[in-house]
A protein has these predicted regions:
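N-terminal leader/signal peptides at the extreme start of proteins
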Residues: 1-18
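N-terminal single-pass transmembrane signal-anchor helix
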Residues: 13-45
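Short, glycine/small-hydrophobic-rich surface segments
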Residues: 51-59, 64-113
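Short amphipathic beta-strand and strand-loop transition segments with alternating hydrophobic
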Residues: 122-132
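Acidic, glycine-anchored loop motifs typical of Ca2+
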Residues: 144-151
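Low-complexity, S/T/G/P-rich flexible repeat/linker segments used as non-globular hinges
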Residues: 151-181
Length: 181
């Protein structure tokens, strides 16, 4: 037969309270974890919103170079594409209307900011300048992540030139202005 604890032991076990020292240690542990986790989470969440313009411009640059490799310099890049969508979403991400990305340049590049029906936070543009011996392009992403009316700008450039042994290329670096707007 199993022995039973005396009645007074059972009531003490059920009513056990934490000492002030145990509470202080627990509070310190929770505070330490929060002090590490919260800033990291906020930083990563913010950085994830900046992936869209960087990734989008890299895809445009790659498509522009691939396009130029198959054409003479005078027609190395397609015609300029206006800011698409024409007004960047303000303070939130939005899905596009059905035909938003139907401009011939976006079709040539097989580019959309996000999959059909998925919201995105940036608008993109592509400008090309074609000459007989040199052609250049500028691709931009504009967004207003905090909704205050001020826009952030991300920009890459590229070129194709007659006699350039490297061929068409995206220029090194990315111009960024007001990245957290």
């Amino acid at each position: 037969m199993a022995s039973r604890l005396p009645r007074s032991s059972r009531s003490r076990a059920r009513g056990r309270r934490f000492t002030p020292l145990e509470l202080a240690i627990g509070f310190a542990l929770v505070g330490s974890v929060a002090a590490i986790a919260v800033p990291t989470f906020v930083r990563e969440a913010h950085a994830s919103r900046l992936v869209e313009p960087v990734d989008g411009l890299q895809r445009i640059g790659t498509a522009a170079v691939a396009y130029a490799r198959t054409r003479p310099v005078a027609s190395a890049f397609p015609s300029s594409a206006p800011l698409t969508p024409s007004v960047p979403p303000r303070g939130h991400c939005e899905p596009d209307a059905q035909n938003t990305w139907d401009h011939p340049t976006w079709r040539d590049f097989d580019f959309r900011a996000s999959p059909a029906g998925s919201p995105h936070c940036f608008s993109f543009s592509f400008d090309s300048a074609l000459g007989e011996t040199r052609a250049t392009f500028r691709a931009q992403a504009h967004g207003d992540l905090d909704g205050d009316g001020a826009q952030s700008t991300f920009e890459i450039t590229g070129h194709a030139a007659d006699g350039d042994p490297a061929g068409p290329a995206v220029d090194p670096g990315m111009y960024v202005e007001s990245e957290v707007e």
